[in-house]
Amino acid sequence: MNSLLEATNLPWVSAIFGLFVGSFLCVVVHRYQIPGQSPSYPRRSSCPECGHHLSWWENIPVLSWIVLRRRCRACGVVIPARYPLMELVTAFIWWMAASRVPEGEFLLLAVYLLVLSALLTASFVDLDCFEIPDSISIGGMVLAPLAALAVPELHEHTWVAHWLSDGLEVTRGASVVASFVGMAVGGGILIMVSRLGARAFGQDAMGFGDVKLLAAGGGFIGPGGVLVALLLGSVTASVVGIANLLRFFCIVRGRDRARARKRSAGRAWRTARVAGQYLPFGPHLALGIALVLLYWEPYLVDWFLGARG
């Protein structure tokens, strides 16, 4: 058992467990959209098309999808590639977390794994439903100060926690205060952005689910980290948004050519803007929070200080 928990083996052991956790997260995301279902009910997984109850080997992450040739064994319906994708992504982030956490800090690692898994779940639900579950956002706001109390190392690199601590080590009380300040900054800045957007454009710039998600994230990464997470999320959202607009522009132009329509590029671009403007912001915030959680020290700090010259 001790050999499995060694620094060289722990990331790979975590990745294997991450595959199975990813399989469970697939169930959570799928059942969130179905009234009357929950992660624990019904107890057995089944094909959403024919209701076939899956055998134990049909639940093996990734491998079962390959063996079944991505089809249900009973009805032959195609099993979406997002299922093995989510399993692999979960395994990857568990591997990264285990690689980043200092050796022997198992409680800190548990917090990291829980937060990263919740962020991944929130991202997939937001992509499907354009909403972020309160169980993740509000639950995160409840859990964050408790985690800060139990694991003060969570805010080891938060300036508020260091300012309130006497020595080099962050105290539990200072860590809890840093968690609350991070939540206030994370939620407050998005509320301000939303109100400014409402005044400038006559509509909310983002949903309240994003506000709660960033507030929850701030509880784990502190006030400075939450600002960097918002910056990273905004950059990735801008890149993806531009790519999405270009994709719709190409689709509109392609359909015009196929139907022998003569429509100007300007009109096609306006159509693409309407069709491609709706993108969930939650996955980008989640990515920013995850990057800060894992790479705030030393990579993002060095990058930020280097950018300031």
Task: Report each predicted region and the residues it spans.
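A membrane-topology feature that recognizes alpha-helical transmembrane segments
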Residues: 1-309
